[in-house]
Amino acid sequence: TQGMIGYWLLQAMQNALPGRQVASMVNQTLVLAGDPALEHPTKFVGEVYTRDEAQALAATRGWTVRPDGEHYRRVVGSPAPQRVIETRLVRTLLQAGAVVICAGGGGVPVIRNTHGKLQGIEAVIDKDLTAAVLAEDLEADALLILTDVNGVYTHYGTPHAKQIPRATPTTLRALNPPAGSMGPKVEAVCRFVELTGDMAAIGRLHDATRIIQGTAGTIITPGGSYGQPNDLQPPQPAAGGPERA
């Protein structure tokens, strides 16, 4: 994710913003070695196998395998992100005016071993939760989770579906969104709003500017409101100064 997709995003941003410095980084994300999620694997990774192949790999390599459609795949734990190791470097690049692409796929999971050294582990970190942690540490003005739907809906997938334009963390969590799709996005924006008191939003990629203006997406704030949309403008970098994340 960080290599191939990072390269695609890097090139697209360079073509869209000629003259602007763009950096794509490989990041490590710190997790707790004792996180209970590591003992309860849920995330599919790697290739697909037949049942016999999967059982043989489970026996020889100690993997946990589960059915995935007609085949079997390995599953690993998804521990909660604590912080992105390279946060200071990301901040330095942002202060220099660069556009930074980072924490793809949630980052490479690492722990601190008994000697205090970083050590990689086999796990998958939720990318939305990592984005929330990084945004908080960078003191970002807002967290936008951009996807392929207009926002968060009640009764999604039914004739009664209705988009939610404004919400608080409490009202959004009460919807109990599916754990494998919208759930992590909702939890990420709720955590960011609760910890910072700032705005977060979920919406369509092409609506990013309108979301900042308050006219699109689902916007989450502590009080469930976001100023007067007509008076809001996308944040601009100060003349001669750094651009906020």
Where are these regions (language model features)?
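C-terminal catalytic "cap/lid" subdomain
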Residues: 1-245
